[in-house]
Amino acid sequence: MARPFFRRRKTCPFSAKDAPVIDYKDVRLLQGYLSERGKIVPSRITAVSTKKQRELAKAIKRARHIGLLPYIVK
């Protein structure tokens, strides 16, 4: 008998002990959570927790406002 499909539970990359701190000045970290068009990738794809997704979105928006990240990529 075949095993039923089992979906592995993803864990938040920011919840571990040695996890990076979400900072608006850390452009390299923030770019990993943007699509190739510059949009914020949803947490169901990146497996980021709800609390950390809000922090991440706020940091990305802050970095965009001061010019560290582009609003859109053509």
Swiss-Prot record:
GO biological process: translation
Family annotation (InterPro entries): Ribosomal_bS18, Ribosomal_bS18_CS, Ribosomal_bS18_sf
PROSITE patterns (alphabetical): RIBOSOMAL_S18 (PS00057)
GO cellular component: cytosolic small ribosomal subunit
Keyword terms: Ribonucleoprotein, Ribosomal protein, RNA-binding, rRNA-binding
MF terms (GO), sorted A to Z: small ribosomal subunit rRNA binding; structural constituent of ribosome
PANTHER family for the chain: 30S RIBOSOMAL PROTEIN S18 (PTHR13479), SMALL RIBOSOMAL SUBUNIT PROTEIN BS18M (PTHR13479:SF40)
Function: Binds as a heterodimer with protein bS6 to the central domain of the 16S rRNA, where it helps stabilize the platform of the 30S subunit.
Assembly mode: Part of the 30S ribosomal subunit. Forms a tight heterodimer with protein bS6.
Family recorded in the similarity comment: Belongs to the bacterial ribosomal protein bS18 family.
HAMAP family: Ribosomal_bS18
Protein name: Small ribosomal subunit protein bS18
